[in-house]
Structures are given as structure tokens and as C-alpha cells.
Amino acid sequence: MLKVGIFGATGRVGKLLIEEILNHTHFNLSSVYVRNELQYSLPSSTMVTKDFEIFLQASDVIIDFSSPEATKALLEVALSYPKPLVIGTTGLDNDIQHLLENASHTMPILYATNMSKGVAMLNKIGALVAATLKESDIEICEIHHRYKKDAPSGTALTLAQSCAKARNLKLSDVRISGRNGNIGERNSNEIGVMSLRGGDVAGRHTIGFYLDGEYLELTHNATSRLTFAKGALDMAKWIVTQKNGLYSIEDALEI
């Protein structure tokens, strides 16, 4: 039985992870890190703690769906107490990305802005289309619930990065997030990344490839956040078998 620690237990996905683990015979909810008192009860066998060292040492693998600041703190402590990590926190800045890369030299880390297998396939296929339909204009649109804090979503940026890489472009040079006023003609290399917020949408991502006379749109819809929790647990089972290094969900799916 795999002992799983949850970091970010009070978040939407964190709560779903806990529910899924408690209903799963192959996992043991071994530790939960909390800064404030939980509003729900957990089994007496689960270590609930504010101490990073105790939290890390109680588990075989850690799943993190928290905030960029919390993820940074986790990584800094994990350097002294290495554990396989599955990180799904979005909105990481360059400094945290570098910390993530450095930490992967001492432990296996799987980082993904989206734990959905369907999104992993969208990312792969999108890059293929971007490379093949070189003359197409690429526009990415993402929709999420009203409570999502970061925009564009980490998933949208990942999709945009893959499309840019497929065309040998640097995303920071070609990304456009929003258009307003008399902006002139569209640059052929632009990759538009647009964000909508409303309701309880779990996640919708569309990559559009627009040509003269036709267009192709690839869309992934998440109908429940449970797909992210299930995906993260699948990744946890995989990452504990890997050597030190930084991995993606595409590595786990071998695509």
C-alpha cells in the first residue's frame, strides 16, 4: 500500500484527493500538511501536522496542489528530506521553476500544470498540428470557474509553449494575451492566449488553428475536478518507481 502525503489539503483538488485515497484500497493517507485547523475529520492513523519534516518522513510520496509560495516552501525543505513529489500547483514563477529543477537532482519530481490524461494528449496533438500546419494562426482559449486566481491558466501556457516550440519560436516573443483598440493586423507568428472566467467550469481548453477557408479546433473539457485527483494518484504510483529527475505527465504516459 502506497503511503501518500497531501500538501494543499484545504483546496478543491486537495479535498478530492483525500476522499479518493480514503476510498481506495491501494493507497494510505499517511500525512496531511496543514497551516490551520481542518474543517473535517480524518482517520486517526493519518498524521496531521504543521511540521514539514514530520510530514515528509511519514509518506512514500507527496502530492502538492497548493500555491506557488507554499510549493516553494515545500521544495526548500524537501531538499533536506527528499521524497518523490507530484506537483500540480500552477502559476510558478521562474525562480520556483529553477528551484524545481534543482530539487529534481535529489528526488524524482513529476510536475504538470494539468493532471488530466486527455490534456496530455491535447498537448501532444496540438504540437503536431502546429508543426504541420505552419501557415495557420494559433489561438488558445481557456475557461475556468470564477474562483480561479491565475490567468492564463497554467495549462493554457503549457499548450502555448508546446505550439511555440513546435515552430521553433520563443513563447515570450510571440504570446498575446488579450487584444484591445486599433492594434493593426495580426502578426503571423502570434500565439493568442485568452482567458474567460465564470460559473463552476472545471476547465475547458481549446487550441484553434485558423487558415484561409478552413480552421481546426481541438478542445478538452474537464467535467469534474475529480479527473485531476485521479490523474495525480496515477502519477504518484508512477513517480515512486523513477530515478531522480524532473518528469512530465507525457513521460509517464510514454507519449
Swiss-Prot record:
A molecular function GO annotation: 4-hydroxy-tetrahydrodipicolinate reductase
Q: Spell out the catalytic residues.
A: 144, 148
Q: Cross-referenced CDD domains, in alphabetical order?
A: DHDPR_N
EC main class here is oxidoreductase
Q: Where in the cell is it found?
A: Cytoplasm
Q: Summarize where (S)-2,3,4,5-tetrahydrodipicolinate binds, as residue positions.
A: 145, 154-155
Catalytic activity from the UniProt record:
(S)-2,3,4,5-tetrahydrodipicolinate + NAD(+) + H2O = (2S,4S)-4-hydroxy-2,3,4,5-tetrahydrodipicolinate + NADH + H(+); (S)-2,3,4,5-tetrahydrodipicolinate + NADP(+) + H2O = (2S,4S)-4-hydroxy-2,3,4,5-tetrahydrodipicolinate + NADPH + H(+)
Which InterPro entries does this chain map to? DapB_C, DapB_N, DapB_N_CS, DHDPR_bac, NAD(P)-bd_dom_sf
Give the pathway listed in the UniProt entry for this protein.
Amino-acid biosynthesis; L-lysine biosynthesis via DAP pathway; (S)-tetrahydrodipicolinate from L-aspartate: step 4/4
Descriptive protein name: 4-hydroxy-tetrahydrodipicolinate reductase
